[in-house]
């Protein structure tokens, strides 16, 4: 891909060597890169939608996101802090929202956390240290929270899995800014996800059933 952009390799050469599939993906990556260079404002939802339509093949966007995740993991040791900041800002306003749009929530969180690490270094490590210090008690609390919910859902005859997770560092930082408080002022540090194993025709009904059970317990 980089070789094509620099003129060291031709798309048609890739077509001959690897077939239409690979050539079309390369062509899509080049088109998206050209669009990116020509567009002055890329922080908007309109640009993200335009980029998705230009890509045509969704694999193009997946490669772009994967490439940015890889780059974000590697730039921590670069001496060029200005370039590091630019890459982190792009990850925050373009690639993380794209990952969210495609349902790649884990990658979205990783991109946001790494962006915060480079853009707001002190805030990132403050929150990380606080989370590490409270991990044991938080994990125990999550287990205590999940148990009665699991019992009620099982009594209702539902098939399900419950997962508890600590919210991302970026998410907590956003709450701290919005509420204008320190880490200790944020109480919703974790989230619970209930995943139903239900037939398609009963999905909606059982989702509402779970919602009703949980709200009855915690209203």
Regions found by a protein language model. Name each.
Residues 1, 67:
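Short, conserved catalytic/metal-binding micro-motifs enriched in Asp/Glu and His
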Residues 34-61, 68-219:
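Nucleic-acid processing machinery
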Residues 2-55:
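Metal-dependent phosphohydrolase cores
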């Amino acid at each position: 891909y980089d070789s094509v952009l620099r003129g060291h390799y031709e798309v048609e050469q890739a077509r001959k060597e690897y077939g239409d599939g690979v050539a079309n993906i390369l062509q899509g990556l080049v088109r998206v890169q050209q669009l990116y260079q020509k567009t002055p404002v890329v922080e908007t939802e309109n640009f993200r939608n335009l980029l998705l339509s230009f890509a045509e093949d969704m694999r193009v966007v997946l490669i772009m996101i994967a490439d940015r995740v890889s780059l974000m993991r590697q730039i921590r040791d670069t001496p060029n802090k200005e370039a590091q900041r630019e890459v982190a800002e792009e990850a925050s306003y373009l690639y993380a929202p794209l990952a969210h749009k495609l349902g790649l929530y884990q990658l979205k969180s990783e991109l946001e956390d790494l962006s915060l690490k480079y853009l707001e270094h002190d805030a990132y490590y403050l929150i990380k240290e606080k989370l590490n210090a409270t991990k044991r008690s938080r994990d125990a609390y999550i287990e205590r929270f999940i148990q009665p919910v699991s019992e009620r859902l099982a009594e209702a005859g539902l098939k399900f899995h419950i997962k508890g997770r600590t919210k991302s560092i970026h998410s907590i930082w956003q709450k701290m800014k919005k509420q204008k408080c320190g880490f200790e002022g944020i109480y919703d540090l974790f989230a619970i996800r209930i995943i139903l194993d239900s037939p398609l025709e009963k999905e909606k009904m059982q989702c509402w059933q779970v919602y009703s059970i949980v709200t009855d317990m915690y209203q």
